[in-house]
Amino acid sequence: PMAEINNMPATIVWDGKSDVRRMGIGVRHAGDDGASAYRIPGLVTTNNGTLLGVYDIRYNSSVDLQEMVDIGVSRSTDKGQTWEPMRVAMTFGETGGLPHAQNGVGDPSILVDEKTNTIWIVAAWTHGMGNGRAWWNSMPGMSADSTAQLMLVKSEDDGKTWSQPINITPQVKDPSWYFLLQGPGRGITMKDGTLVFPIQFIDSTRIPNAGIMYSKDRGTTWHLHNLAR
C-alpha cells in the first residue's frame, strides 16, 4: 500500500508485528497561504455528507488573541481524502481604523442545524487591546472598544459561502463580565431542533465559568442556560 508524506509518495511496509495504522491527512500546515500557524480546530459533517473543518488562521505567530487572526474553513466532499482551497469565513480586517493585528477573531466553534443544513460558526472578535492577550485585556462592558464581541456567521450552501458577521453580544453577555467567548470545537442540534453551543466567560470576580448558549428559533435569537463553574 502507498501513502503520502510531505506530498511525496511513500511505501507502507508491514512486518506482521504490529497493527497497520492509517496515515493522517494534513489539512493545514504551517506556512500554507502565508500563515504562521493553524490552531483550535473543529469538525462537522453536514446533512449532505460534506466535511467542514474550522480553525484559526494565525498569520504572524501561534499566539492567542489579540493578534492577526481570522477564521478559516476547509471543505471536503470525499470523506476527507481531498480538501478544497481554504475559505476565510470570518475576518474584521482594519475595522475602526485599527490594523488587522488589532482586529483578530478566533477560537471558533461550528454547528450544523440538522433540520435545515444551515451551518453556524461562532467566534470571539477582539478590537484594539494593543495586541495584549484578550484573556487579560477584555474588560467589563458591551462595546467593542471595551470587551470582546461574540460573533456568528452562517452558511446556507453547504459551507461554500458565508454571511456577514452577526453580533450577538447584546443578547447573551452580562455587562459585568470581563470576557465572554465560545467553547472551541463544535455545537449540536438537539432532538427538538434546539441549537446548542458551549460557552465560557470570566465573571465580575474574574472567575472562569462554563455553560451553553442555545437557540430555539433556528439561530435568530440566542440565550444562555444555567451556568456552571
Listing of model-derived features with the role each one plays in the protein:
Residues 5-229:
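Asp-box/BNR beta-propeller blade signature and adjacent active/binding-site loops
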